[in-house]
């Protein structure tokens, strides 16, 4: 699905295992400083004390399910996300997923822009 100059079709809701024990990350596009992923969560959350700290700007939309995001260094309270909600997270804005719905898969579309973790500091 990631071949340059090739038309690619897919369905963001295909191949979802509602009983998966681990989150699933599928790369849809990766080139020229842009990464687009489908993420499927089935009740997973960030471990206690863990914060994402990515060198890239992130834009995430929740397409199905429900989730709660927390931000470490902002006045923003934990934010419950429902289908159709999206958030833009600046580079190095420490955040975590504190909850995803265990009864229905949470399907995310994530777009990362900027240096890759190998080029920058990546995740903490």
Residue ranges and their predicted role:
Residues 53-54, 59-83, 98, 120:
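A short beta-strand-loop-beta hairpin characteristic of the jelly-roll/cupin
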Residues 82, 91-118:
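Ligand-binding loop in jelly-roll beta-barrel domains
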Residues 1-51, 123-124:
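A short, N-terminal "cap"/entry segment at the start of jelly-roll beta-barrel domains
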Residues 33, 74, 102-104:
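Short strand-connecting beta-turns/loops that link adjacent beta-strands
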Residues 35, 68-70, 96, 107:
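General beta-strand recognition
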